[in-house]
């Protein structure tokens, strides 16, 4: 059985839209890449898939070597299969599809992106761990994660600061408080 781990990169003020603030080298970058080693695959929604699939297949280097061959699972109400970039479309209800994947796969399933799909999975209690890679910058305008109505309590399981100033915050969800 797989655990579902959400992993996202953000600024101190919560901006997840990657910009000039992103620090892409050093010990934290290796640690971020290593979270995919031995995983069952990547999980993402349509918007994240379209952005990543439009970029990574033509890239080379350590990140590309790690990400390109990995199995990817994509939830979408509008995409139709077959998908490119070693990706499989989750058919039908996304939450039920993720439950099936968690039951069938061996190794962590890493969820990339913090939009509507991630929020839905968090509200359904399907995310086992959240990893926030917080970069030492405040960026102001931009997309923020988990904009929604539900309130979720988290328990900190690790905080690690790297030489670059990037901090990894690992949490487990504890309770969802309805409105």
Which residues make up each language-model segment?
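Enzymes that bind and transform nitrogen-containing heteroaromatic metabolites
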Residues: 1-179
């Amino acid at each position: 059985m797989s655990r579902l781990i959400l992993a996202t990169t953000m600024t101190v003020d919560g901006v997840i839209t990657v910009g000039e603030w992103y620090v892409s080298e050093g010990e934290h970058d290796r640690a971020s890449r290593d979270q995919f080693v031995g995983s069952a695959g990547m999980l993402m929604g349509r918007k994240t898939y379209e952005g990543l699939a439009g970029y990574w297949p033509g890239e080379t280097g350590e990140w590309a070597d790690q990400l390109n061959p990995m199995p990817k699972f994509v939830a979408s109400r509008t995409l139709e299969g077959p998908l490119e970039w070693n990706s499989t479309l989750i058919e039908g209800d996304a939450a039920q599809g993720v439950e099936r994947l968690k039951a069938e796969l061996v190794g962590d399933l890493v969820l990339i992106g913090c939009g509507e799909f991630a929020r839905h999975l968090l509200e359904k209690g399907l995310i086992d761990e959240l990893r926030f890679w917080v970069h030492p910058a405040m960026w102001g305008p931009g997309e923020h994660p988990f904009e929604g109505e539900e309130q979720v309590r988290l328990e900190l399981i690790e905080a690690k600061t790297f030489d670059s100033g990037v901090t990894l915050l690992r949490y487990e969800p504890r309770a969802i408080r309805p409105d």
